[in-house]
Amino acid sequence: MHTLNIKSTKELKEFFRYKGKNTPVISGHRGGMVKGFPENSIETFENTLRHTPAFYEIDPRLTKDSVVVLMHDATLDRTTNGKGKVSDYTYAELQQFRLRDPEGHVTDYKIPTLKEAILWSRGKTVLNLDRKDVPPEMTAKILTECKNDIIMITVHTAEQAKFYHDYNPNWMFSVLVKTEEAFAEYVAAGIPYSNMMAYIGPENKPENKILLDMLHAKGVMAMISAAPTYDKLPNAAERAENYRETFAQGVDVLESDLPIEVSEAINDRR
């Protein structure tokens, strides 16, 4: 298994620090989407790590009885053999359902809890918690209970980042930064450069160079998400070329539904 051997928050910050010429970093969007393996499942996280080192963007959601599970959609219909809203079921009731793979086939895998995922990730990878319907206070409490600070939290505003930073100054953030002004707001809120990785959008545009240079000057890595763009290209060769080009243009982290493909693409040309 290709693990990310990160043992402390100091090592976590060092891993995500821009150092001039970085090794490309791969983020599996919802863990990755491969036949036989459902999104947002521990089994999928493990499968991806069999092929490539990666960290994962995941989607925490609340059940009816306030258990936090992993589920992107507000409803069960697309990714499980259940129907209706996640929030209409207790955690115990959700255990009757099984997850579907990207092609819609029902697997043997159950819906995991956020706690299960965080505890599993220790010594293996980093989980990046996206924002869904879980109150920040509850997220912070669960992270504290799990005693695993080797995590990342997606935030869309400086105010959101400040809440978590005040709660635990060790936590890393994936910050939404599409302009220099947006980045300045995080800095003004007291978020250290070392606690940030910047998500700059779904494609690498020429006008991003100024933003990339500014982030890199502060030691902050920049991430592009290929899920809504390059991942949708019709064939593997086109996708591979765009993955390689994204890194060649200075992006440090590529988030993708197809992390194994990304790894194969960039390793073919080294």
Q: Residue locations for each model-derived region?
A:
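Phosphate-group recognition and catalysis centered on beta-loop-alpha active-site segments
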Residues: 1-270
